[in-house]
Amino acid sequence: MLTLFHHPFCPHSRFVRLLLSEYGLEADFTEERVWERREAFLMLNPAGQTPVLVVEGYPAIPGASVIAEFLDEMHGSLEDGVTQRQLIGESPQQRIESRRLASWFGDKFYSEVSGPLANERLHKRYMTNEQGGGPPDTDVMRAARRNIRYHLAYIGWLAGQRDWLAGDNL
């Protein structure tokens, strides 16, 4: 049985939900409001961030990249080592580029664009003042909107160079 602790607007959680779907895995989804800092959730992931995947017989698996690696190891190849359903490429070069782009979007894009926008426009609505809630900070939102232009230009450049963002093969 798989249980994913996630938040609907968390891009890292969306990434893991997509991976689960690609592998054909069913999971129970538990919405986690990380700003509430629930003790039971902090026991699963002391960092207090989503996503966290709980798999029977394994310790809690925190973080999108750690979950992606776990799913790839457990469901991406056959027992004889022949690649069957690896989602991040077959060659080392393909896997490096897939991981690099996952890191780009999971870290850089999130910290400069989607994270600030989601926090200011969505999360603050549900937070108390003590949790960091309140009206959106328009300076933060303006900075994120400026940053998105740079990221979209980079995505456009990648799309112009390749058939897919991470390379010429899907």
Task: Locate predicted features.
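Amphipathic alpha-helical packing segments from all-alpha helical-bundle domains
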Residues: 139-159
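Surface-exposed helix-capping loop/turn segments at secondary-structure junctions
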Residues: 77, 157-168
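Short amphipathic alpha-helix initiation/capping segments at coil-to-helix junctions
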Residues: 148, 168-169
